[in-house]
Amino acid sequence: MNIGKFKYIKKPSWFGDEGPIYEHEGLNEVLRVLFDQNTNDVKQMSVWETSFPPGVGIPLHKHPYPVEELLYVLRGQGMETVGDEQREVGPGSAVFIPPEVEHRIVNTGDEMLVLLVVVSPPGIVEKDLFQKKVKKATQVWEKDYF
């Protein structure tokens, strides 16, 4: 009896604890994807947790496409720059980054800075982009990738 070929269909997870974890070696950043198009079939946003050791952060950048970004500090202390504003952030701080506005964050404390990040529309956490960043983290930032 011929029943045809089987095709693997990944069932999306409704829980955010099954996503991939990426480490940007050149930045010492660890990023854990919680929800995105590839992990959970989330269509309107990407959500991840990212952490930086003391003295480390994301350089000043802006995204080359319209995207809204929300940051929520879970642990640690940092300095966030959005446009021409700069502010110290800590647990419970929430930051909105409008589309096409330069921004950066640096861990200014003595423990890990841990953030919950929400991006809409999704796309910045797409698998191929992060694989590129992971493989070439140092070169990516030197070339002002964002």
What are these regions (language model features)?
Residues M1-Q44, F130-F146:
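A short, N-terminal "cap"/entry segment at the start of jelly-roll beta-barrel domains
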Residues L31-D36, W48-P64:
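Conserved short histidine dyad/triad with adjacent acidic residue
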Residues S46-T50, F96, E111-E126:
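A short hydrophobic beta-strand segment most commonly corresponding to one strand
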Residues E49-P53, H63-V82, V118-S120:
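Short, conserved beta-strand element in jelly-roll/cupin
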Residues L60, E80-T81, I97, H103-D110, ...:
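Short beta-strand His + acidic residue motifs that chelate non-heme Fe in jelly-roll/DSBH
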Residues P66, E85, V101-E102, E111, ...:
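A generic "binding-loop/recognition-motif" signal
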Residues D84-P99:
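Short acidic-glycine-tyrosine-enriched beta hairpin
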